[in-house]
Design a protein with these regions (language model features):
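Extreme N-terminal starter segment of soluble prokaryotic enzymes
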Residues: 2-4
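Conserved catalytic core of the tyrosine transesterase superfamily
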Residues: 42, 101, 107, 133, ...
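Conserved catalytic-core motifs of GNAT/GCN5-like acyltransferases
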Residues: 105, 118, 123-140, 152-153, ...
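Acetyl-CoA-dependent GNAT
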Residues: 7-80, 87-97, 145-149, 155-167
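Conserved GNAT acetyl-CoA-binding A-motif
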Residues: 94-105, 128
Length: 167
């Protein structure tokens, strides 16, 4: 089963929105997705397996920071390397676009996602109280710095090698 990471376009929206609705309590609307895809300084990629969209990642590029805004994987495809492949593609493309740091927020209860992000060198630096709606759960703020350097490049090569072995 091959996994392709491709740029998101409007033909992917129905599948992406279905995934969003399964994994997020307040999924993005079609209008918001369309607006995001049209905005500058955005990087949206989806994972396609056997012709079906199984995940999506979205990044906002601001100055030399890359802010991961969304990572969503179809529940049936979770724990199969999809999120890792999406994060790898996002990190590589953000670096190519000039990013020197990677940041995101993640639910404090989402320990699985936190472990994934730690693999990418993201470390907790703070909390945002009541960040997530509708339940008011706190967000853990995570950052990775110097992602344009040789140590981070080696980290990404290691992750890519693990993905190749798992495929």
């Amino acid at each position: 089963m091959s996994l392709d990471i491709v740029p998101v376009d409007k033909r992917h929206l129905k599948a992406i929105m279905a995934i969003d609705a399964q994994v997020y309590p307040t999924p993005w609307s079609r209008r918001l997705w369309q607006q995001e895809l049209e905005r500058e300084h955005r990087l949206y990629r989806c994972a396609v397996r056997d012709g079906s969209v199984v995940g999506v990642v979205g990044v906002l590029l601001v100055a030399d920071d890359a802010h991961v805004m969304t990572v969503a994987v179809d529940p049936a495809a979770q724990r199969s390397g999809v999120a890792t492949a999406l994060m790898l593609a996002a990190a590589e493309e953000a670096i190519a676009a000039g990013a020197k740091a990677l940041t995101l927020e993640v639910r404090v209860s989402n320990t699985g996602a936190q472990a994934l992000y730690r693999r990418f060198g993201l470390a907790p630096v703070g909390h945002r109280r009541g960040y997530y709606e509708p339940d008011g759960e706190d967000a853990l703020v995570m950052w990775a710095h110097d992602i344009d350097g040789p140590e981070y490049e080696a980290r990404l090569r290691g992750i890519a090698a693990e993905l190749d072995v798992a495929a």
